[in-house]
Amino acid sequence: MFSLRSLVDYLRSQHELIDIHVPVDPHLEIAEIHRRVVEREGPALLFHQVKGSPFPVLTNLFGTRRRVDLLFPDLSSDLFEQIIHLLSSPPSFSSLWKHRSLFKRGISALGMRKRHLRPSPFLYQDAPNLSQLPMLTSWPEDGGPFLTLPLVYTQSPENGVPNLGMYRMQRFDKETLGLHFQIQKGGGAHFFEAEQKKQNLPVTVFLSGNPFLILSAIAPLPENVPELLFCSFLQNKKLSFVEKHPQSGHPLLCDSEFILTGEAVAGERRPEGPFGDHFGYYSLTHDFPIFKCNCLYHKKDAIYPATVVGKPFQEDFFLGNKLQELLSPLFPLIMPGVQDLKSYGEAGFHALAAAIVKERYWKEALRSALRILGEGQLSLTKFLWITDQSVDLENFPSLLECVLERMNFDRDLLILSETANDTLDYTGSGFNKGSKGIFLGVGAPIRSLPRRYRGPSLPGISQIGVFCRGCLVLETSLQQLDIPALLKEPHLADWPLVILVEDLSSALSSTKEFIWRTFTRSSPATDLHIPVSQITNHKVSYTPPMILNALMKPPYPKEVEADEATQNLVSSRWHSYFP
């Protein structure tokens, strides 16, 4: 059975955890301390005295690459490469014997183990008081305190298939939480099924520090692949439970610090938010389902796990990258023709992705692109850059140059309007509505990309810079903007891609900043401007340059920023936190 206290002791012994013993406030103060430590690539934090709660708070468990590797010491892409090798090779005794450890691991993942623990490790409240939980308010305009690491367990009312997902939960009162079910997530699908039957959906929320449970809950697994099964496989041992809940039948996992049981209420919605999210902006107030808690279990010495999200890089970036590294060998198996794939955490993962594919016949690359956009959470990708060249996808400037050198604007740009959009992304035409852009660059280069801008100053443009070969960045404002005039500017004709930003120096300060400012503030259908040369058989041909308007535009939400009072408080107390 997993022990969070043992994990805390281990991290402390590795100088990867600091204990903070002075009283701290879960309203804004803890989050600001956490963000500063993450920015400095610092340790996990255990806050022992949290105002208004008897429970300590653990944050920043995954805040560096080193710590993620410590938490998953035996977990690498080699595991999934072995699976691919086994599945792709003709069966033989020698092959099966060589990979016998996989079979042991697979057997360990089957089923769950009931542990007869006396006394029970959990204390029980049948009249729950959620105000005892030290839920964090992370940003000054957040709608209230939130559970930020909830592992939300549901089962399909249709077939009983389970799902474990992570959906933020806002506290409304001592027994009611908002349930931020997003599109393309299993819990939301289960709630839809329940509402079709006019039934409430049983929901169990685990708060656990088990890294494997957390990793499994956010993994983009194929539908109907149980996350608890995946967790057991990753940690190479069965998950254990003390009992099953008498009403829902859900397992009460031993690895939990807290367990909340209850229901998502059919037909009932309540305004949820705002919330400073992992895109780096506030997601706005919208109506979402509610969770009515009927029981609260917690361990006697429970530790409350939490995280803080915001502008990249935060904890979720390192955990998301670990997942991509682990699952990358599976891409060619799940999506034949796709050799490598990366979603960029710098843009909140869903806004931007790139892939290396095979082009063995005419337009096979487009087939692979459409396959990617039809796969689970990848279907929420906005900008997808595709090439058949061997390029390091971690190096986004090189990837961008590779595609821009090869794009034939008569056939290699495809804009899909009126598609589903990530719930947290407000660049589209409405809530959950947006568009997608596919940018193909395959074969031999067809153009030489400029390295420097040699033209004159441009009307309405205050500064001009270069991100990489072929990509020009112009500083302007909504008031000065004249895109039709820019499209006719002859000195831009040699630049395949032109980006419009408010702050050139910030946009070019790093690749991370460029990606975040460019792709979280634009949508392909509404913000990509390029002259149409002809339309033949419903096929649109274009003439470069592409001008991407990445300015902040109404009604985009605000960028998250700590308030001055909290910043001053944390600065003044810094040496008391870390004496």
From Swiss-Prot:
Listed InterPro entries: HBDC, UbiD, UbiD-like_C, UbiD-like_N, UbiD_Rift_dom
Family as reported in the entry's similarity comment: Belongs to the UbiD family.
Organism: Chlamydia trachomatis serovar D (strain ATCC VR-885 / DSM 19411 / UW-3/Cx)
Coiled coil residues, start to end: none
Domain of life per record: Bacteria
Pfam families, per database record: UbiD, UbiD_C, UbiD_N
Record's protein name: Uncharacterized protein CT_085
Entry GO MF terms: carboxy-lyase activity
GO cellular component, one term: cytoplasm
